[in-house]
UniProtKB/Swiss-Prot annotation:
Substrates-to-products reaction catalysed: D-glyceraldehyde 3-phosphate = dihydroxyacetone phosphate
Record-given protein name: Triosephosphate isomerase
CDD domains for this protein: TIM (cd00311)
Function: Involved in the gluconeogenesis. Catalyzes stereospecifically the conversion of dihydroxyacetone phosphate (DHAP) to D-glyceraldehyde-3-phosphate (G3P).
GO cellular component annotations of the record: cytosol
Native organism: Herpetosiphon aurantiacus (strain ATCC 23779 / DSM 785 / 114-95)
EC number: 5.3.1.1
Lineage: Bacteria, Bacillati, Chloroflexota, Chloroflexia, Herpetosiphonales
Amino acid sequence: MRRPLLAGNWKMHYGVSEGVALVEALSADLTDLTDRDVLVCPPFTLLGSLAPLLDGTAVALGAQNMHYEAKGAYTGEIAPQMLKELGCSYVILGHSERRQYFGETDALINRKAHAALANGLKPIVCVGEVKAERDSGQAESVVVGQLRGSLAGLSAEQLRGVVIAYEPVWAIGTGDTATPADAQAMHARIRAELAALSDQATADAVIIQYGGSVKPDNVDELMAQPDIDGALVGGASLKAADFIRIVRFK
């Protein structure tokens, strides 16, 4: 049985005081979870401040990006082991905003995925199509191509340590959401591709999140789909009440 993973991606929001207030509200409320996992991914600048507050709580800590090298002359970058030392257990890789604004490729994301796993971090590998690709009937081929490139060279055992996040780019921050049926269809296609890359048992073990304007009023229907195993939440994760309601989906 796959345990749902509800992750909040704060993106480039919040300073220390706002971040502390948010995680204190989350950790105070989310004390009785037994069948799902919760994660927040704040900006790098907050990791050191929030890690001690989350230690021993039900809320795990993750980062929004990392470099694939262990150290070196990479100005502005963060190494996997640095994240581990700060208490991170997850790292988001290949978010569509990284692909769009910073030119990240499947090959680069693949190097990062290998490095994350080698350093004991669980990568959340993001895939998703833009609106033109969906409208032209290319959504599945685009997503499958991203999966193959981003996960190349990973063993079945390694794949079991990866989380996939399907985020249709046209739905991120727009208020538009894929219908539960459309989201389920893509998640099922992703799981079928994971089976082709490894085996069915491995594919059945991998958590596949949905992301893209997940809100309190649509999370229940999304999470009722058989291949949707959680959510990667953007804007709604910045408000404690909204994110708590999402975590407590029914």
